[in-house]
Amino acid sequence: MSDNNQATSNASVLTGRVVSDKMDKSITVLIERLVRHPLYGKQLRRSTKIKAHDENNVCQQGDLVRIKETRPISKTKSWTLVDVVEKVEKI
């Protein structure tokens, strides 16, 4: 028998752009995906806004972030920040 000490996670991980960071310890992430139209075959851009938990308030509006699904944190939050992929420059 092999001893596997690492816990495997089935939680889904998504990448998106932060559109709002005005809440304390929370961010709103815009997730975009491409969907093919069933009849015409054209690729359509669909988007979803997801609220995620940002414990240390490290994200700014415009950052590219990776989030993962977790237990429900509040009524609308069940995602948490994994890491910031790309920081936006402040002018």
Swiss-Prot record:
It comes from the Bacteria. Pfam families: Ribosomal_S17 (PF00366). GO terms for cellular component: cytosolic small ribosomal subunit. PROSITE patterns: RIBOSOMAL_S17. One of its GO terms (biological process) is translation. Keywords: Ribonucleoprotein, Ribosomal protein, RNA-binding, rRNA-binding. InterPro entries: NA-bd_OB-fold (IPR012340), Ribosomal_uS17 (IPR000266), Ribosomal_uS17_bact/chlr (IPR019984), Ribosomal_uS17_CS (IPR019979). GO terms for molecular function: rRNA binding; structural constituent of ribosome. NCBIfam families: PRK05610.1, uS17_bact. Part of the 30S ribosomal subunit. One of the primary rRNA binding proteins, it binds specifically to the 5'-end of 16S ribosomal RNA. This is Small ribosomal subunit protein uS17. The gene is rpsQ.
